[in-house]
């Protein structure tokens, strides 16, 4: 089997900055990580390789600094890494991103053999659109299984796959033919730790780097901001809120504070309760 895993280097969401003119995320100087859902996708691919053998190629599109995330993926056990990097890709929305990645996946198929499965995370934590995986499948003309929790089985000879998808009503069991694209939810198994041998291999590995021309991109106008019809009207970070803490010396204090807060927001409630208490006392006095 040859499986391709698309990963993305994403900024630390706690330190995101936004360009005031283009409304795109400014990634320079911001700490980055591999998108967590993409790690779940990588773990699913590694699990299949454990069972069926084969190779795993990890692919990302981004600036030269994205090489760091690819090397991290190699430490988990991926066999090779491809970095699609070109200034013309800057500012890509999901439509432009899927065009570039689908083009690179076709090139990977020619260079290293066609993919049986293509994995992505269900979404990225910086965009949260969940559009890239399905968009790649559409451009490649392959089937897709989205929000997959577990790959149950793969029949390589008959080119079929069975997987589980979580839904509000329970678990759906899905069947489709290979090749197909899978977007993964949280991993059902814990993400493995890379072995020391994998870490050493990753440090020495040569990352394959392709420009738009190298990957076979035929229409540059479909890339980057030029190829992105999505208009972001405003991007902003929520204002930071100061956390306040109270020193509690007895169990009665928080209870009294809660009562005071309720009465402050609903002043009529205190009056109504006082009236009920007075009426109750009057009733008891009348019975004596």
Curated annotation (Swiss-Prot):
Record's keyword terms, sorted: Electron transport, Nitrogen fixation, Transport
SMART domains the UniProt entry points to: ETF
PROSITE patterns the record matches: ETF_BETA (PS01065)
Entry-linked InterPro entries: ET-Flavoprotein_bsu_CS (IPR000049), ETF_a/b_N (IPR014730), ETF_b (IPR012255), ETF_beta_N (IPR033948), Rossmann-like_a/b/a_fold (IPR014729)
GO molecular function, one term: electron transfer activity
One GO biological process term: nitrogen fixation
UniProt family annotation: Belongs to the ETF beta-subunit/FixA family.
Subunit record text: FixA and FixB form a heterodimer.
Role of this protein: May play a role in a redox process involved in nitrogen fixation.
Name under which the protein is recorded: Protein FixA
Species this protein is from: Bradyrhizobium diazoefficiens (strain JCM 10833 / BCRC 13528 / IAM 13628 / NBRC 14792 / USDA 110)
Higher taxonomy: Bacteria, Pseudomonadati, Pseudomonadota, Alphaproteobacteria, Hyphomicrobiales
